[in-house]
Amino acid sequence: MTRRFVHLLVFLLLLDVCTSARAQQAAQRRSPGFDVEEATIERIQQAILKKQITTQGVVEAYLRRIQAYNGTCVNEPQGILGPITPIARAGQINALSTLNLRPRARAAWGFDARKARSMTDMVDEARNMPDSLETAAAQDQQFAKTGRLVGPLHGVVLAIKDQYDTFDMRTTSGADADYANDRPPDDATFVRRLRDAGAIILAKANLAEYAVDGARSSFGGTFCNPYDTEREPGMSSAGSATAVAANLVTCAIGEETVVSIRWPAAVNSLVGLAPTQELVSRDGMMGAGLNMRVGPMCRTVQDAARVLDAFAGYDPKDEMTVFSVNRKPSQPYASFAVEKRLDGVRIGVLREYMSRKLFAQADEESIGLIERAVADLRKLGATIVDPGAAGELFTRCIARYAPELANSAFARQYPKLFPTDVSAQAGADQIATLLQLREDPSRVPPELTLRTLNAGGFGATGEGKYWINRYLSERGDANIKSNADLITRARFYQDPNFPDRKQAREQAERATALDTSVRLQGRFAVQTVLLQCMQEQRLDALVSPMSTIPPRKLTAPREPAVNGRTPIGWSLIGQQGFPVITVPAGFARSIWDRVAEGNGTRLVGPVSAALPVGVDFIARPFDEPMLFRIASAYEAATRHRRPPPDFGPLPARR
């Protein structure tokens, strides 16, 4: 259903819009035979078709849960911009920063003004911007006339990460900045496609400001892990993840540059898909870059596939999506997410990411859960290619191909092999050295593995400033026109336990050139090496941990990097454009926490816990069908997803 058609229906309904009293009565309705908690897309649509609930009733059911669970989850003695302290079992998560409700409906539901659709248009009466309840009412009216759903996502209630443009809701990437109009002029392409498929955009999700690190933004505040509100909920897309985990929405849309879809999904017992980068448009994304991609976060593999079906494909506004032309399957992605067996599928085990000898006590239990996942895949009929607990799947293959393909990065990584003079010019014949290594890969340093393949640096310069300025130029706001304006016309939180956002913007501003050549070379090198390694072993997919580190306490020190393992999980393969899906793999029951001690830190434990762990499945670019086959079979056999116990069903209202 197009936006224009929705607007027409909403206009016809305006005379009959609920008053505040009637809206409150609607909020108290509970439809027999349907519960929104853990409801899948199929379950929601079947309930609508069977007239167990209306689309408006679905939205209201989620709003009741938002009322109950979306409050502040930390102590803020100096206000939203000051230092925070965690609250044990807070019963709140602060996942959603903006609600798609007109002022009258927002007041009737008891939400404060900071959750308004716009802070620059507090009247908010434009008829071409129906709110979520009005859109739902329009769907109900259309369904009453035709008996058919308006589209494949009819009744599906979504949250969108605040990094993405929504024409009817404020978009600031978590910043408390002085936009003349905090609403962008149009939807991001993928948001428009979701609406056209019938999805109802209920909220903008809180995020780490400007989609960097940490569970905090200057406008939205701190958000928390629903499985332990004293802990971080993942990376920048964690507001999206926690909203889905606590059943505040059906699914949400995240963004991933490093692990920002997969890590929040893993620690919130969700399915998170970081698709092939060129498959989904990045149009309307604040701060897009070469490694950024759009993906769904849902409670089931099938739901993630249905959302991908709605927005995947070429978009002339994002030239990278040209690579997706003729690369989508002829049948829907959702049709692949129905497997029960994996006979004939060859899956390689990335033991490089699972070594008990190389990592720390903090990694132990998660490694055990991934080993159990490998055993489950074998039971499902998959052919498991496993180098063994002490082995590494790709190290020999990497030694053959990486030095030549990564050349300059490889030379920087091993200066003893490739000495330079004081002017950084080659001090010896590097070509001769590379040829020798090609002829005899045993001479390649043994520490060159999948863990260290990018240690020579695959970075870019100027991206942070370039992409923000490009986005703001296209947005055309009268006040905020550049990264420099974001520095001078915004307020920033100040807390030593979280990254300094103003400092990050100032650092980005110092760039005067855009250079992505090294990143592009690294991307080509990693893709070529891994595709060749997979082909040599006839692998359809790979399995690995998403992360082996439990989420830390919100104000605790980070676990230090060890042998290539970072405190936020394994990111190399996904960063280079391979599609990766994270699926719940169980719960860590006994963990180790990093705490400050004097001028350093130490591990304490074991600590009793019940924290979700995720397993990653990785496929070749554009082979999402293989991912959905493996993930759906594993999900069906294991059913590890559990909702957070402190965010259960609400009491029935009389």
Where are these regions (language model features)?
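Short glycine/serine-rich loop/turn segments
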Residues: 87-90, 99-119, 126, 130, ...
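Boundary at the C-terminal end of the N-terminal hydrophobic targeting segment
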Residues: 21-23
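Short, well-ordered alpha-helical
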Residues: 25-172, 176-180, 210-212, 321-330, ...
